[in-house]
């Protein structure tokens, strides 16, 4: 589903990704963890073309998004191909990013109508079913300003699912929430995992990573320095930096 090889990314003089390679197969849940500033969110944004890599190769569902040219510099496919390939990935951000002037239902149907050209009468039933799935059907006509943070994030998840993605990317989806509200979002994500959705999750929720993820990738200083089965990683991390990190967060 995702095959990223030797990714490099700089912001000015700061090297953010240094030769990152990552493969995720269909139905896998991979947790991306590590200290702040290690490159986790940048990696996610590069996979979804929100940031551009300087070097490296990314394939999504077997299709090339970017590859190196003869000079070793990243060259992307055409913009239309980028849009088509990236449409297969949904992304959920830390801060929800809902349209405040749209109702909950309107937030869900906007992209399928404007991006995929769907008719309102064919997307509304699907959107309503997604709202039932995340437990917010009764809020379909509410505006985001009337929702709690946890409710907003569940709407954001439903909105991403409305585009029928093959892959879901989560960038610290609970980090902006009151601790009392994280559970409702994590339950929704657990449900997606049980339905075999392919997921890459940047998270500081270690219990979720241990219980739900198939694999854990630990990042430090722009590199994946340890990659193992989730339970094995938490029981016996091999890399010194990973051990120190877990001692602080567990």
Where are these regions (language model features)?
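Conserved ABC ATPase signature
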Residues: 143-147, 151
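A short, proline-enriched helix->beta-strand linker immediately N-terminal to the Walker B motif
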Residues: 162-166
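Short coil-to-helix segment of the ABC ATPase nucleotide-binding domain corresponding to the Q-loop/switch region
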Residues: 102-110
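The feature captures the beta-strand-to-loop junction immediately N-terminal to the Walker
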Residues: 33-35
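Catalytic Walker B motif of ABC-type/P-loop ATPase nucleotide-binding domains
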Residues: 168-171
């Amino acid at each position: 589903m995702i095959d990223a090889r030797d990714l490099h990314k700089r912001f000015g003089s700061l090297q953010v990704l240094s030769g990152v390679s990552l493969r995720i197969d269909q139905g896998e849940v991979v947790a991306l963890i590590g200290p702040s500033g290690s490159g986790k969110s940048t990696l996610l944004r590069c996979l979804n073309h929100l940031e551009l890599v300087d070097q490296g190769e990314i394939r999504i569902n077997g299709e090339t998004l970017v590859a190196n040219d003869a000079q070793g510099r990243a060259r992307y496919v055409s913009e239309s191909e980028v849009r088509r390939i990236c449409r297969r990935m949904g992304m959920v951000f830390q801060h929800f990013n809902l349209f405040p002037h749209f109702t909950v239902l309107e937030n869900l149907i906007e992209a399928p109508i404007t991006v995929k050209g769907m008719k309102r009468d064919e997307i509304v039933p699907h959107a309503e079913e997604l709202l039932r799935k995340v437990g917010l059907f009764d809020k379909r006509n509410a505006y985001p300003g009337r929702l709690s943070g946890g409710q907003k994030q569940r709407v954001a998840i439903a909105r991403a699912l409305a585009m029928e993605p093959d892959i879901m990317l989560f960038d610290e989806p609970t980090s902006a929430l009151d601790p009392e509200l994280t559970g409702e979002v994590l339950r929704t994500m657990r449900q997606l995992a049980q339905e075999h959705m392919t997921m890459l999750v940047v998270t500081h929720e270690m219990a979720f990573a241990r219980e739900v993820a198939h694999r854990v990738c630990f990042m430090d200083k722009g590199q994946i320095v340890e990659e193992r089965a989730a339970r094995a990683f938490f029981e016996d991390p091999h890399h010194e930096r990973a051990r120190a990190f877990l001692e602080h967060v567990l």
